[in-house]
Regions:
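Active-site and channel-lining beta-strand-loop segments
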Residues: 8, 32-53
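Intrinsically disordered terminal and processing segments
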Residues: 1-33, 55-62, 66-122
Length: 122
């Protein structure tokens, strides 16, 4: 992935991904492990912080690990829509694949999975 800067802090098991170095950003907690950093004025991703990275990057016995985006429910409508917009376009969608879990016909929960193959080649 061109243009992205990766920094792994082994002692904290945290991966920092920066798309626009030095740019001030608003942090949006997608859940306890994922922090999306955005420029609200330009509606662009500035970076992603992935906590517990080594755990999240490991597949389970039945496949890749999906994470509910529980933090979206706590956002204002404006930030919720901005986060979903940014998650669905480059460069973020090359790292986090957005999907939906539907436990019933009336409920949809946004989830994501970490596309580790993109990080290995970066």
């Amino acid at each position: 992935m061109t243009g992205a800067h990766f920094k792994y802090d082994e002692s904290r098991d945290t991966l920092y991904i920066t798309f626009v170095p030095g740019k001030k950003a608003t942090g949006i907690a997608l859940n306890d492990q994922l922090l999306l950093r955005v420029d609200k004025a330009t509606r662009q991703a500035v970076g992603i912080t992935i906590f517990d990275y080594s755990y999240l990057a490991q597949p389970t016995a039945i496949g890749v690990r999906s994470l509910p985006l529980t933090g979206l429910t706590e956002l204002s409508t404006e930030l919720h829509e901005l986060a979903l917009e940014i998650l669905q376009k480059p460069p973020v969608n090359a790292i986090l694949l957005l999907s939906a879990y539907s436990p019933s016909v009336t409920e949809t929960i946004p989830i994501t999975l970490l596309q580790t193959e993109m990080l290995v080649t970066a």
